[in-house]
Amino acid sequence: MCKMAIIPDWLRSHPHTRKFTHSRPHSSPCRVYSRNGSPNKFRSSSTTAVANPTLSSLDVKRILFQKITDRGDELQKAFQLLDTGQNLTVSKSELRRIITDFLMPLTREQFQDVLAQIPLSTSGTVPYLAFLSRFGGIDLYINGIKRGGGNEMNCCRTLRELEIQVGEKVFKNIKTVMKAFELIDVNKTGLVRPQELRRVLETFCMKLRDEEYEKFSKHYNIHKDTAVDYNVFLKNLSINNDLNLRYCMGNQEVSLENQQAKNSKKERLLGSASSEDIWRNYSLDEIERNFCLQLSKSYEKVEKALSAGDPCKGGYVSFNYLKIVLDTFVYQIPRRIFIQLMKRFGLKATTKINWKQFLTSFHEPQGLQVSSKGPLTKRNSINSRNESHKENIITKLFRHTEDHSASLKKALLIINTKPDGPITREEFRYILNCMAVKLSDSEFKELMQMLDPGDTGVVNTSMFIDLIEENCRMRKTSPCTDAKTPFLLAWDSVEEIVHDTITRNLQAFYNMLRSYDLGDTGRIGRNNFKKIMHVFCPFLTNAHFIKLCSKIQDIGSGRILYKKLLACIGIDGPPTVSPVLVPKDQLLSEHLQKDEQQQPDLSERTKLTEDKTTLTKKMTTEEVIEKFKKCIQQQDPAFKKRFLDFSKEPNGKINVHDFKKVLEDTGMPMDDDQYALLTTKIGFEKEGMSYLDFAAGFEDPPMRGPETTPPQPPTPSKSYVNSHFITAEECLKLFPRRLKESFRDPYSAFFKTDADRDGIINMHDLHRLLLHLLLNLKDDEFERFLGLLGLRLSVTLNFREFQNLCEKRPWRTDEAPQRLIRPKQKVADSELACEQAHQYLVTKAKNRWSDLSKNFLETDNEGNGILRRRDIKNALYGFDIPLTPREFEKLWARYDTEGKGHITYQEFLQKLGINYSPAVHRPCAEDYFNFMGHFTKPQQLQEEMKELQQSTEKAVAARDKLMDRHQDISKAFTKTDQSKTNYISICKMQEVLEECGCSLTEGELTHLLNSWGVSRHDNAINYLDFLRAVENSKSTGAQPKEKEESMPINFATLNPQEAVRKIQEVVESSQLALSTAFSALDKEDTGFVKATEFGQVLKDFCYKLTDNQYHYFLRKLRIHLTPYINWKYFLQNFSCFLEETADEWAEKMPKGPPPTSPKATADRDILARLHKAVTSHYHAITQEFENFDTMKTNTISREEFRAICNRRVQILTDEQFDRLWNEMPVNAKGRLKYPDFLSRFSSETAATPMATGDSAVAQRGSSVPDVSEGTRSALSLPTQELRPGSKSQSHPCTPASTTVIPGTPPLQNCDPIESRLRKRIQGCWRQLLKECKEKDVARQGDINASDFLALVEKFNLDISKEECQQLIIKYDLKSNGKFAYCDFIQSCVLLLKAKESSLMHRMKIQNAHKMKEAGAETPSFYSALLRIQPKIVHCWRPMRRTFKSYDEAGTGLLSVADFRTVLRQYSINLSEEEFFHILEYYDKTLSSKISYNDFLRAFLQ
């Protein structure tokens, strides 16, 4: 029972009845069946409905709702037909077939939108109850519709009875039955299976017993295994049905008479469920009247029932629940009629119902009074039905015209001056649609049958006015109509009327909108829009206007988006045909008055209204001149704007052709003869006419009589010309108001004025703007105007400065423009930043000099500590106080007042306001060999060596003690670690070691841990790692002590040749140590290390090895261009290296970097983005961390960190974020320590494990970048972001590990590849550029490398993968792994050739005396210069500016890395070998500096 209660009633079996039940009575059953028995009636239509792709989702939803409401029973039966399993679901294809056959065809996208709104089952099928409820508003679980009666027949029907009943059911609804057959017949074969035939009959006709169907199928030769032709079956059923009907005609007539007699006994509407066809015999007004009467009687019951259905007391119930309550206590009305009735009360079936407001309208006494006509009475005759239809139309018309009756009568009298004069049907219908209510074609036709029974085509206005007055009198005397307030028209009808009205008056409506929107922004004010709507739609109430505005209102500004309204009507652009322009204040009455003035006779007006396709009337010369006068005198903005669109400015002239276009666009079309006469009259010259000349001519008094005296060419007098100009004070007063009238905001005006789109406007542009605003100034007055604004002719303005000009505020003559104010503001900001940095340095110098002095490592020849720019900068960056280059220069100038470039400790502390103390303020001795370039005395070297030896001796002694007491220490550690975590704190470790007889200070213990590589976590140490390190130190502790006793070789005193030999000796004597060091770097045992790591290891073993010596060493070994060095080959074969066999030795060394995994590359890319985000938005990210850290623990959770990464870096997948989280500093509770994170990622180079080695030193030799990794990751910063003030610079004496900066890929000589590609790209470069732009969504000028490879294959460019890789490396200009397609296409299409010269002349290189020192001139050097000459000559000016931007000090010299970066930035075709030869020529002294002026001068002779 419970299961049956859940299933709707209409899913249960049909009962059967032997009586004939008709939805409406027919006069003769024979006529019905003879019509239905026609063969064409059940033949499938040959036409196929086509889906309309222009329908929006809202349109589809509205149409589906309407059709489901009308055909709900058919749809339910169709779903039941396909739902063979009775599980209340159908497949997606079955749902689409039902929608296509029974409702409307849909496109694939439209069907997907419908499907997306239905919850699918777990098996992917569609619950069709949800579909009907969602799109039809049918709550089938509450208000189910039964399939038939409830009882089956006990006796078996005869064959004749079956044929008659089945035939009646089939042919009464033949279209639905045919659609059901076609629904099953998916392949359109015309055949169905016998079981499917039975399902159709039982679903759409009646239930059949097995013996009845067996008898029926045997009669029609339907076998179980044979397909049935349903067209033939229906044809045979039709023939047999006609024969049977003739036999039982008498009984049928008797049953019909009994049914009609039974219906005639009813005095009111049936309280039980009745057929919709019976309700159709009553008008909606009568149903409404009796519905209100019955509701007033059951008001309390209805109120209690609705209150019970609103348990939350929100005041809203569903539409279906409202219908159930009203069906129970008032009338059980069919759903379609109920929806129409509720629309009269302003209710919709798709929204929640405010039941309290609904009942309030009936609770008032006047709302409960009804007419004295009593209950509904059924009208049987045709005349009475037609009469009621006419009354319905008149009632509907008067109900909606009661408020507008006066304006309706006025409009009728205006259009027809005679009170009893006729009016055409078209004019009458247009007035009704505009002033009253929109009538359908059938309703208007029935109204015309009463007003124009003779079908003359005209309507007597006096007759219609009498009907209006009579209706008003009747409504005053009638208690029902007087008491009842008219219902507002439903919004759907109002919206349709508004759209129709706008469509009819499209051009006038659009012109009036544009008159309020001169800038064509698509927005106007709400009040202006209301004025326009009252002109064209006076019937629009305030509530309807608010509803309309809510759909097309801009939320931000509150203005009306009228183009959105036009788009809803189906108009995407301005109308093409332009009738006469309608001014702002021209109402509909004025339009009718114009018709009244002309007033042609009735036949002419009829002809004009019928002929809708005629073109706009051509105007004569006199009419156009009169129109010109009005436009100039009233300053019509539409005409002026259209004129200026062609002339660009008031002084600009337009030709005769453009002037005619202006006339046509502003609604003044003329034929050629009249136009020629017009140009003659207004004095149009061959060179054209400006707007000022045109306006001056028509403002002149002689132009007042164009009919009598043709106007002379406009030659304004001098007084008029002077009066046309205004003074500077008047312009200053009018400028803000005119600007506000012409543009919606200052940005629009600035964008219009900035013709070259560079973000800057000059005073000439400002003058053009004033002319556009019709503010005409003479030159001297314009200069005075600029003076009032604090400007001058040479000044330029950006947008913020221009915006200040547009603000309404008093201007002063001594007020400067913002361009002069802005640098002062920046100066104030920079001074504030400098002062903050200065105060921080003061605090650190007073309290923590040891921390501050770690960055102060340089001394002069006298042993005094000195400071340079980099020392202060490194200190500030170490304390997370970054300054811009300009701010730092101001801070340094505050200390270095004499401009020496360095200051002493005494001078620095004096500037800080601190007294100098030699004992306290001394250089830091820690890490003394890692300082950046200093000059020391020999005595200082000896002191440093002594300190180093003492620390080494202490470390050896401590190590010996630890090894002697290893077992005791191990037992003590195990005993101390009671939690068994293997970790103990440093303090606890010191106590244990002291108890075991190995007393160590915290500094000594820290030094040991660092030397052994034992890591610390939250000030705790894994003692197992510590003990293991002690054991491993046994082998290294017994090293021979000769090296300790002997002084290390000082490479700084050797020349490069001697340095190479000494390096060979060091490598031979320290192979084991070198192998250990290289193995620590080569964790994957590939045999390769990066060039930067290789150089660092050698410099660690070769004391004081300079960069020049190291570079010379790499060149001798021919490995200076190798990004990866095979250290195993180097150690095994360097002892037998000879300079004579250097080439052969280098060729045998294995080449190629080890392959990297895609995940590692992606991780480096993410870390680079994270580093870039932190450095560029440091304070913002810090603030976000602090906002999350509400407990002030300096930690945040994993989810909070991920949210910041998603917002500041990029949205990461779970796998990517897991790998990133593993690299973050996390405490024991799994929370991120964001101070450590910020200090790690805010430095110039991201010190991350995955990024180690990806950056290279900006030097020659070891600075050769990583080809395989650098080009595939975005770790290296783009060249455009490497500003001179923020990039790291290395000193020649700086170890590689301390000066690692983001590197760039190597130079590439792709000239042969590009030369071969030119022929192929010449024919397809436009299409290639288009494809690249489509892939470049962000419009950055570059695309992914994979996209470029795909385009190479698509356009068949015939280049190998290696060549593609070379091109990708070359055009990765931003070092972000992307391909700069614009530069690539330009280099292939723009063929630059060298300057042609005579055979006796060749390019010269500077002589040696012009340069300080020049290197060797090789053939490779000359060939490289000759090849790149055209490119350098083409772009040498911007290249020189770029060189200067990298040369901060203005020395004319650049480092090798910066020089390489600039060459890559301009796509210079150079290989690394050629680059090496250029360096040899321009840097013979190996100073790692290139004179870029000497380099450029070679190409400019």
UniProtKB/Swiss-Prot annotation:
Transmembrane segments: none
Keyword flag Mitochondrion: no
Assigned GO CC terms: axonemal A tubule inner sheath; nucleoplasm; sperm flagellum
Domain EF-hand: residue ranges: 70-105, 172-207, 297-332, 403-438, 439-474, 504-539, 634-669, 741-776, 847-882, 883-918, 964-999, 1069-1104, 1176-1211, 1212-1247, 1359-1394, 1434-1469, 1470-1501
GO MF annotation terms: calcium ion binding
Tissue: Specifically expressed in the testis.
Biased composition, class Polar residues, residue ranges: 35-47, 1270-1279, 1286-1301
InterPro entries (alphabetical): EF-hand-dom_pair, EF_Hand_1_Ca_BS, EF_hand_DJBP, EF_hand_dom, EFCB6
Keywords: Calcium, Cell projection, Cilium, Cytoplasm, Cytoskeleton, Flagellum, Metal-binding, Nucleus, Phosphoprotein, Repeat, Repressor, Transcription, Transcription regulation
Protein origin, superkingdom: Eukaryota
GO biological process annotation, one example: flagellated sperm motility
Binding site for Ca(2+): D754, D756, D758, D765
SUPFAM superfamilies in the cross-refs: EF-hand
Modified residues (Phosphoserine): S1290
Annotated region (Disordered), positions in chain: 18-47, 699-718, 1246-1307
Predominant location category: nucleus
Sites of Phosphothreonine modification: T884, T1294, T1304
Interaction with AR: annotated span: 1407-1501
PROSITE patterns: EF_HAND_1, EF_HAND_2
Protein function: Negatively regulates the androgen receptor by recruiting histone deacetylase complex, and protein DJ-1 antagonizes this inhibition by abrogation of this complex. Microtubule inner protein (MIP) part of the dynein-decorated doublet microtubules (DMTs) in cilia axoneme, which is required for motile cilia beating.
Name of the protein in question: EF-hand calcium-binding domain-containing protein 6
Organism: Homo sapiens
